[in-house]
């Protein structure tokens, strides 16, 4: 009996040691981090007001005051299409034009049951750009019901293009960014 107990304990210890020390290089570099909205340019002047809280808990931002160039992706963790296309946005954000801030990326999480559900989604997919939340459904008038929806907004706050539905491959997303902002990714 002692022998079997010793084998079981040794096996459990080895399993714990091996799994806790292994790394998963497929995970995004920032898994577990909820980005701040501090880098958003919300300096635009607008007579409209649509206050949305940042998912990092740092406060509210008036959506109508955000200036681009910026890609705004409306998503929800419950949305199958959002889960499908999110790796494309993660890839897009790795591009130098996004990394150096020439073009910004903003997520808007809608229709969640709680903030934590959205935070968990961000952590799971490694979404390292700022995200606003709309638990109350205030953005339905602006974005329409459902997700995903992606907007392309210029430096003056003008909507250049709107894509309704799921991106089926990264090239489709990258091409729309290039056309909207006149850049080469």
Residue ranges and their predicted role:
Residues 68-70, 75-78, 146:
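Short pre-active-site segment immediately N-terminal to redox-active cysteine/selenocysteine motifs
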Residues 83-125, 135-141:
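Structural microenvironment flanking redox-active thiols in thiol-disulfide oxidoreductases
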Residues 120-127, 133-185:
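Thiol/disulfide oxidoreductase modules built on the thioredoxin-like
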Residues 49-70:
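A short beta-strand-turn-helix
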Residues 74-76, 108-111, 134-136, 163-165:
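Active-site-proximal beta-strand/loop segments in catalytic clefts of secreted hydrolases
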Residues 1-53, 175, 184-185:
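N-terminal targeting signals for export/organelle localization
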Residues 71-72, 105, 150:
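Hydrophobic beta-strand anchors of alpha/beta hydrolase catalytic cores
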């Amino acid at each position: 009996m002692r022998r079997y107990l010793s084998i079981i304990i040794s096996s459990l210890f080895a399993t714990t040691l091996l799994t806790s020390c292994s790394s998963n290089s497929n995970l995004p570099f920032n898994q577990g981090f909820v980005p701040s909205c501090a880098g958003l340019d919300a300096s635009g002047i607008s007579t409209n007001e649509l206050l949305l809280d940042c998912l990092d808990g740092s406060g509210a931002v008036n959506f109508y005051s955000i200036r681009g160039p910026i890609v705004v992706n409306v998503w929800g963790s419950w949305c199958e299409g959002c889960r499908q296309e999110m790796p494309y946005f993660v890839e897009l954000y790795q591009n130098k034009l996004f990394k150096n801030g020439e073009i910004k990326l903003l997520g808007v999480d809608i229709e969640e049951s709680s903030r934590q559900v959205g935070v968990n989604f961000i952590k799971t997919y490694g979404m390292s750009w700022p995200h606003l939340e709309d638990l109350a459904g205030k953005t339905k008038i602006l974005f329409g019901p459902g997700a995903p929806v992606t907007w392309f907004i210029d430096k003056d706050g003008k909507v250049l293009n709107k894509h309704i539905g799921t991106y089926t491959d990264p090239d489709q997303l990258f091409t729309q960014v290039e056309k909207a902002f006149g850049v080469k990714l």
